[in-house]
Amino acid sequence: MEKLMKYASFFYTAVGIRPYTNGEESKMNKLIFHIVFWSNVINLSFVGLFESIYVYSAFMDNKFLEAVTALSYIGFVTVGMSKMFFIRWKKTAITELINELKEIYPNGLIREERYNLPMYLGTCSRISLIYSLLYSVLIWTFNLFCVMEYWVYDKWLNIRVVGKQLPYLMYIPWKWQDNWSYYPLLFSQNFAGYTSAAGQISTDVLLCAVATQLVMHFDFLSNSMERHELSGDWKKDSRFLVDIVRYHERILRLSDAVNDIFGIPLLLNFMVSSFVICFVGFQMTVGVPPDIVVKLFLFLVSSMSQVYLICHYGQLVADASYGFSVATYNQKWYKADVRYKRALVIIIARSQKVTFLKATIFLDITRSTMTDLLQISYKFFALLRTMYTQ
């Protein structure tokens, strides 16, 4: 099971978080994680605070475009910070969830083959690795874009004067461009960008690992039901049904636990992402220079890839849970006792109530959620365009 969790554990360690306990920790390890976490949080809070001050001052000076740009950065900070704190808050619940998943995790070659574990493990690992690398490359390219511009245009090609710039707009009450303070500010902003990105990647990849296991258990349940050969003996067949129902109920409880842990951060993620996509798209359509368009495009891709990843796994869970009702109907139930057939009707009725990944009670997450999000973003985009032209 650690193979499924390795990418999430790596990025959580980078921001000083242990999402679940795995035995006793030494005092030194706890201290190190504590220092790393609060160093990340304090720096990220500092950058977010001064970005907020910049937004206020930009609105006061009628610098609408700059204010919108800074708002998209604040949204990025908000999502990262919220995911980090919610995971720390839900550490006990996550530990209980992971322990229960370990209890039903298929160990041994025979069980691994029955559950088709290598396929699920390989798919989850590939998606997690590609997503982590994509998001990391996009964010670090965004963070270092201003430095690359300075060295390429100003120092190497000498075709235009760029000057020293910072990756994110924030209020700084002194002249920092030709001052030694530029370098600490550059480090602070890059550190904050890395913190927010790592906080988001780790939580997204953890959700993928947990959702993959839910899908695996739903699929195993469906295969077991569909391929089971009935004996026609009510006592023997009813024992099989009892085991299936208990297994199904356990998976449903695990699904509820996942929604309880991730529901609020997912809701906040979708709300903020709709604004971020809107803000970034707006900036790309108001005549900014081509190099800035490239920078904004990277930011847009990172936000949309995150939303699609969550929606994709939400769809997989929904399809797998509904597939159990189809598998139950496809069983050779016509050979069974009439009492067995009546029991199957109840099981089918229950399994047709689809299990979703939920952003609290407000949103069932599937691929169609991506469409809804883009529609909301476009509405805000149209509103911003109207305000800007007026």
UniProtKB/Swiss-Prot annotation:
Biological process, per Gene Ontology: detection of chemical stimulus involved in sensory perception of smell; signal transduction
Subunit structure, interactors included: Interacts with Orco. Complexes exist early in the endomembrane system in olfactory sensory neurons (OSNs), coupling these complexes to the conserved ciliary trafficking pathway.
Gene: Or85b
GO CC, alphabetical: cation channel complex; dendrite membrane; plasma membrane
GO molecular function: ionotropic olfactory receptor activity; odorant binding; olfactory receptor activity
Role, per record: Odorant receptor which mediates acceptance or avoidance behavior, depending on its substrates. The odorant receptor repertoire encodes a large collection of odor stimuli that vary widely in identity, intensity, and duration. Forms a complex with Orco to form odorant-sensing units, providing sensitive and prolonged odorant signaling and calcium permeability. Involved in the behavioral responses to 2-heptanone, amyl acetate, and butyl acetate.
Organism: Drosophila melanogaster
Keywords in alphabetical order: Cell membrane, Glycoprotein, Membrane, Olfaction, Receptor, Sensory transduction, Transducer, Transmembrane, Transmembrane helix
Extracellular side: 52-66, 148-200, 282-291, 382-390
Keyword Membrane: yes
Location of the protein in the cell: Cell membrane
Residues on Cytoplasmic side: 1-30, 88-126, 222-260, 313-360
Glycosylation site list: N179
Swiss-Prot/TrEMBL domain comment: Residues 146 to 150 play a role in odorant (2-heptanone) activation.
Annotated TM spans: 31-51, 67-87, 127-147, 201-221, 261-281, 292-312, 361-381
Protein name in UniProt: Odorant receptor 85b
Family per record: Belongs to the insect chemoreceptor superfamily. Heteromeric odorant receptor channel (TC 1.A.69) family. Or49a subfamily.
Keyword Transmembrane helix: yes
Expression tissues: Expressed in olfactory sensory neurons in the antenna.
Pfam families the UniProt entry points to: 7tm_6
Other remarks on this protein: The atypical heteromeric and topological design of the odorant receptors appears to be an insect-specific solution for odor recognition, making the OR/Orco complex an attractive target for the development of highly selective insect repellents to disrupt olfactory-mediated host-seeking behaviors of insect disease vectors. Odor-evoked OR currents are independent of known G-protein-coupled second messenger pathways.
Domain of life: Eukaryota
Bilayer topology: Multi-pass membrane protein
